[in-house]
Amino acid sequence: MKASMFLALAGLVLLFVVCYASESEEKEFPRELLSTIFAVDDFKGEERECLGIFKACTPGKNECCSNRVCSGKTRWSKWKL
């Protein structure tokens, strides 16, 4: 009887420890996710040196990415046709 009570108590303690560890990992997950998102956004800003589609541009300058041209009418970067 004492052995079964000891095993039941040890099982409850083990369950508590596992649940506590899982909960602490869940609390840190949003922070890690946000830091990863902001790190990727910073990297994207440094990587791109040309204007994407529908971005404001100046006609005559070569600001748009390849396969795109600055429209003189709308002053937006658009696909070359």
Swiss-Prot record:
Residues in the signal sequence: 1-21
Tissue spec: Expressed by the venom gland.
Keywords: Disulfide bond, Knottin, Neurotoxin, Postsynaptic neurotoxin, Secreted, Signal, Toxin
TM region positions: none
Disulfide bond entries: C50-C65, C57-C70
Keyword Transmembrane helix: no
SUPFAM superfamilies: omega toxin-like (SSF57059)
Superkingdom of source: Eukaryota
Keyword Mitochondrion: no
Propeptide part(s) removed at maturation, as residue ranges: 22-48
Stored InterPro entries: Huwentoxin-1
UniProt main location, coarse: secreted
Subcellular location: Secreted
GO molecular function per UniProt: ion channel inhibitor activity; toxin activity
Gene Ontology annotations for the cellular component aspect, listed alphabetically: extracellular region; host cell postsynaptic membrane
Stated role: Binds to the nicotinic acetylcholine receptor. Blocks neuromuscular transmission.
Domain commentary: The presence of a 'disulfide through disulfide knot' structurally defines this protein as a knottin.
Homology family: Belongs to the neurotoxin 10 (Hwtx-1) family. 51 (Hntx-8) subfamily.
Name listed for the protein in its UniProt record: U6-theraphotoxin-Hs1a
Protein species of origin: Cyriopagopus schmidti
